[in-house]
Amino acid sequence: MFKIIKCNQINNKLINKKIEINGWVKKIRNHGKVTFINIRDRYDEAQILVSDEKLLKITSQIKMEYCIKIQGKLNLRPLELVNREMKTGELEIIAENIDIISKCNELPFMIENNNNASDNSKLEYRYLDLRREEQKQKIILRSKVIHIIRNHLTKQDFLELETPTFVKSTPEGARDFLVPSRIHKGHFYALPQSPQIYKQLAMIAGLDKYFQIARCYRDEDSRGDRQPEFTQLDLEMSFIKKENIFKLIENLIFTIFKNSLNITLPKKFKKITYKDAMNIYGSDKPDTRYELLIQDMSKALKQSPFDVFKDTLQNKGTIKALIIKNQAHNFSRSKINSLEEHAKLYKARTLYFTKIENNEFTGGIAKFINPIKKTLIETYSLKNNDIIFFIADLWETACKAIGQIRIKIATELNLINKNIFEFLWIYDFPLFEYDEDTQSYKAAHHMFSMPQAKYINTLESNPSKVLGEVYDIVLNGTELGSGSIRVHTKELQQRIFNIVGFNDKIAEERFDFFLKALEYGAPIHGGIAIGIDRLLMLMTNSNSIKDVILFPKNSFAASPLDKSPSKISDEQLKELNLTIENK
């Protein structure tokens, strides 16, 4: 009898024992009277030695990635043939039986080295790409992380609840994916962009601790880090404050990293307000792995004779600056021009600069800076070979543009430590933002977030000044998740709907069922949703969330694997009472 085992179960205790393993041919080497086969399964790989003449005839038919069954006796390898790069490198199986379970066509790319394969090819043959150790381990880690999440939250009395997948269309910013109803002709379901309303209904039901590994769907324009369907950890709690969410998530993420990567994170994460994040880092999702802090030079440059600075300050703008210490020699004119063009992509009028050489400001706008050089040098401890970049504009534009320059410079100067994980909470977000195109307010996060108490009575008088009980969690410059304390009264929810342009009639049409529920004793509640795909992308240092999704779509929201989306038959269209108009 042969004992069926996996490759990782091969060990010295099985020497001289008869064993059977099944897997895929990773490598095959024919040495005439002896053939060596490396077989791979999910767990590891093993070497097979074939010397029997009858079996050699079979191995002559075997090619890479054939699925095979091997039966044989486990032996120690000769010392000189030990492979230290393999976990099972001291052992090999002397083949007694070989069965070809199934053959493999000519490969579209090499499994072990598919760097030359196109992204579309790897997606079309994703089942082959997943045989690569690196890709396989990412998917295994995904399973492990989700298991840790479930265990951790269940131990804390959370209920894993499933919210509907077919819901009423209540657009949350992106377009809904719509599903026509055959029974209710002319009516449509939507696939949920998030379980937001339904988890709030669960709180109203008294199910005070909810979580879900939720599938979400958004019909967004193509972008590299987006997928039309994605997975998030969605959770909600009743009778809490935001600090309860912070503590819960910090403990959860600490457990995830410790139990999956054996990395010990700080027990508490840094916290910073939205305004400070914008002022110091130029981003509401800052990367804090490197310093390179933004300076507000509005006061210091007030006496500069430069008209652009004067006009900006007179028009209630600001002057933001980046000081790059001892690096002026690394910034050629062409590199500075490139940075200027980069700043303009983020609506800045331009990017100004000056360098310090021989205790004088030189280049760029030096002639406008030298009259106040003593003040600047003393205030900012400037030295020779420093270079300063300036953006003068309205506050938000100046912050965002100089923030993007910060990222670009840090990348080009290799200032980013890619071996650390810097988590950060951002809070005190504006509840609303003004859309210049539509001349109206919209929710900065979503319409169900609670205003801070001090703004509730004067909500409508100046919506752009209102701060919300809203928070984001950021990892290495990527927004991982967003949450808030929720509105729990119908009256306040209707006021917020009105501010974002939903009058009572529209609000009733779209959210009547939710507004009704708010009249039946809703508790104080709040929660968060964390992108599992993004978290895993960062944990594995991947370039895209596609790497950590089992069968992802490409950047055009299409699947090269199954060729979806696809046309449907005229019969199906007729059943759904749909017609296609060609325009």
Swiss-Prot record:
Q: Say which domain of life the source belongs to.
A: Bacteria
In Pfam terms, one family for this protein is tRNA_anti-codon
**Which EC numbers does the record give?**
6.1.1.23
Q: What is its main location?
A: cytoplasm
Query: What are the start and end residues of every segment in region (Aspartate)?
Result: 196-199
Single biological process term from Gene Ontology: aspartyl-tRNA aminoacylation
Q: Name one GO molecular function term.
A: ATP binding
Q: What is the similarity comment for this entry?
A: Belongs to the class-II aminoacyl-tRNA synthetase family. Type 1 subfamily.
Q: How is this protein named in the record?
A: Aspartate--tRNA(Asp/Asn) ligase
What is the organism field in this record? Borrelia recurrentis (strain A1)
Q: Which gene encodes it?
A: aspS
